[in-house]
A protein has these predicted regions:
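Alpha-helix capping/termination and helix-coil
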Residues: 102, 124, 168-172
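Carbohydrate-binding surface patches
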Residues: 181-210
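Short, solvent-exposed helix-loop connector elements
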Residues: 101-107
Length: 210
C-alpha cells in the first residue's frame, strides 16, 4: 500500500521519524465507500502510522460533552479500541484542535474543565495541547487570519498541566487499558492493569466532588 511504501522510503532519508496520521470520522469513511471510493480505517492506517488523531470517535465525544449522548456511549467505544487495535496502539488525545470548539468554551465550569483535562492525560495515547489551551482560551481562532494569542488574557493552568504530564510519565501505559462511565453520577473510571503494575484514575466529569 502507498503509506507503507512511503514510510519505507522516508526511513532511508529520515530514520526514526514519527508518523502522525489524521484519519476521518466514521461517517466520512462510510460515505466515501458507499460511492465506490477507497477510505482507510484507523486499523489500516496503524499499519503505517505511529499515532492517529481521535477523529474516528470525535462525533461521540461531541455528543457526550454537549449532552446529546450519555457518557458511556463514547467511553464504551474508547474501551473497545483496546481490543480492536494492536495492544501498542497510540491515539492522539485532545479536547480541542484548530477546527473544533475550544475546551474552555465546551467546559465553562472550572471543575469540569480540569477533570476532563486530567482524564485526557490519563488516557492511553499521546496528549495534544492546542495553542492557548494552557491559559483556557475560549475563542476559536481563524484558520486564515493571523490571531496572536494573548498569553496574559486567560487563566494560566500550565502548572496543572505540567503536574499531569509528570503523572502520565509514571503510568504503566504498556499494560491493559480499560475505561468505563457511570452515567448517573457523571464519573469515569480508567485503569491500567498488568502483571507488573496497576494504576486507577477516577474522574468526576460532571464537576461534582474534588
Amino acid at each position: 500500500a502507498f503509506w507503507q511504501e512511503a514510510r519505507r522510503a522516508v526511513e532511508q532519508v529520515r530514520p526514526d521519524a514519527i508518523w502522525l496520521g489524521e484519519s476521518v470520522h466514521l461517517a466520512h469513511i462510510q460515505a466515501f465507500r458507499s460511492m465506490g471510493f477507497y477510505a482507510a480505517s484507523d486499523t489500516e492506517l496503524f499499519t503505517a502510522f505511529d499515532i492517529l488523531y481521535p477523529y474516528d470517535l470525535w462525533p461521540l465525544y461531541e455528543g457526550v460533552t454537549e449532552g446529546r449522548l450519555p457518557l458511556s456511549r463514547w467511553f464504551d467505544a474508547v474501551d473497545y479500541q483496546e481490543v480492536s487495535f494492536d495492544s501498542c496502539y497510540n491515539k492522539l488525545r485532545c479536547l480541542e484542535n484548530h477546527d473544533t470548539r475550544r475546551a474552555a468554551d465546551r467546559f465553562p465550569e472550572e471543575k469540569k474543565l480540569l477533570a476532563w483535562t486530567a482524564l485526557n492525560y490519563f488516557m492511553k495515547g499521546t496528549v495534544l495541547l492546542y495553542a492557548g489551551e494552557e491559559i483556557c482560551v475560549k475563542h476559536t481562532p481563524s484558520l486564515f487570519e493571523k490571531e496572536p494569542i494573548d498569553w496574559n488574557g486567560g487563566r494560566d493552568i500550565s502548572a496543572y498541566l505540567a503536574k499531569l504530564a509528570t503523572i502520565k510519565k509514571q503510568l504503566p501505559t504498556d499494560e491493559l487499558f480499560r475505561i468505563s462511565a457511570d452515567d448517573a453520577q457523571g464519573i469515569v473510571t480508567a485503569s491500567y492493569t498488568g502483571p507488573a503494575a496497576h494504576a486507577v484514575g477516577v474522574f468526576p466529569l460532571a464537576g461534582k466532588g474534588g
